From Swiss-Prot:
It comes from the Eukaryota. It is a multi-pass membrane protein. Residues 97-114 have a biased composition (Low complexity). The keyword Cytoplasm does not apply. Has strong predicted structural homology with PEX16 proteins, despite the absence of primary sequence homology. The gene is PEX36. It is found in: Peroxisome membrane. This is Peroxin-36. Residues 71-114, 128-157 are annotated as: Disordered. GO terms for cellular component: peroxisomal membrane. The keyword Transmembrane applies. Keywords: Membrane, Peroxisome, Peroxisome biogenesis, Transmembrane, Transmembrane helix.
Amino acid sequence: MSNLEKQIRLKNLLESLNGSKSQADLKKESQTLIDIFKQTRQKMIHDQQSNLHPVTSIQGKKLLNLRKALQNHQKHRDNIKVVKTNAEPVSTHDQTVDSNSDSSSSETLIDTSTSSSFDNIKRWLHETNSNESQSKGRPSEYTHVNSPDSGVSSKSGQLSMLTQDSNQILLLIKQLTAKYNMLESFFINSFEQLIALFDNFYFLSSLIGFNTSNSNSKITRLLRNFIKQASKIWLVIIFLTVKNLFIRMIKLNRTEKKVKLERDILMSRSPNSSIQYEYDAMLLTIRTSKISTFLEMLGNVNEFAFYLIQVMNWKVSKKVKNILAGISWIMSIYRMSKDEIQETNPSINNGLKSSDDIIDEYA
């Protein structure tokens, strides 16, 4: 998104604050705050990683003010939802009803004077950016939103058309990617239990030693043929699983760096802030997920090597096969115990963000 589009978006946002706001309007405003917060955070993280300029206290103030504004706005929305649910009377100072609205509408209308978060946005736009422009000796990225510009309307029309086309293409790509990931996850999860059963079967068969005894019997030949054909299917499934785990590990490492950098930016602005607990909790969740992902990768790579030997008919000693089968069996026990812990203790991560939520937030 270009600077001009950001200016137009913020201008329209602030100009729309002159009347009463419904729950739908508050939801849109909250999403806008989230978008602005993510754009500002990504810009500072990119500049810091690219060594374009050192992180200043003004940038830390930007991010801290935006985070506080977002939290206050979401708290305000939650309070309004509680009032609406309990059907308690609300004073006219905190609530106004639009006379032109439909009488059948049951939405609660809120006076914009209670939206203190947007006052923080205004102060952030008018104060911190002007200070940053003076300190760097260049125009601010976010200019004064109320200053009129004669060429904005014509340029905004062209930019909006290009932006809509590009957004539609990106949205289509995201939808197709999401559908493929859902299909792939469903395919892998459907065969995951069968893979565990197959690991247990081969491990027990290797202990019994039916591969060496009665090698010419009909049952032995059928079992060998079944193992060889089934290994081809398991090989594809495990390859997809290893690929997903490798991508997840990359995302976790990237997210961990962003969380650390954002924590350093905010702590440099407010060293005694209690916000450090939130970032420490996120880092702990990420590191725990990295360990779990690494163990999953190790087990799946072992299984990939094991099934590859079966498919390619490589000459490997029985000792190596037994070791690979034993590791696969141990990993199947680890997976079952991990799933059991998550099912019996659903509140183990109560109050904390999951690693997937953190990855999506910093994507």
